Amino acid sequence: MSEYKELSCLAYDLRKKVVEMVVSGKGGHIGGDMSVIDVLVALYFKEMNISPKNMDDPDRDRFVMSKGHSVEAYYAVLAAKGFFPMEEVIEKFSKFGSSYIGHPNNKLPGIEMNSGSLGHGLPVCVGMAL
């Protein structure tokens, strides 16, 4: 199977996981998730130098999800990459007391910063690069 086909199949499967998350959590921004999942899969599984094993490496790539309301897709990709168990995310998404909240939460492995307010990702990334 070609690399493109493998990534397309992964994105398709992760879309299903996003739907499971939204149903389990009784809410979410599913349209935004569906629009960004292909980009996240391509970045995390083809382009970026990032894994649960290299989070302390100063040369790792960093990703900031400024479009924080599409967090379900972000969680699905991070879970598929091995940062945390997929079933845990689906079960606990948007539940009281859970770390898997409706915007990226940097208390979770693989998430560089909290986000939600549109537009603050770019200046934060510039600061990280400096």
Predicted features, each with a name:
Residues 11-27:
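N-terminal capping segment at the start of a domain
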Residues 1-14:
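N-terminal hydrophobic or amphipathic helices/low-complexity stretches enriched
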Residues 1-2, 26-27, 87:
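A broad, low-specificity signal for short, low-complexity segments enriched in glycine/proline
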Residues 6, 18-21, 33-130:
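Cofactor-binding active-site loop characterized by glycine-rich and histidine/acidic residues
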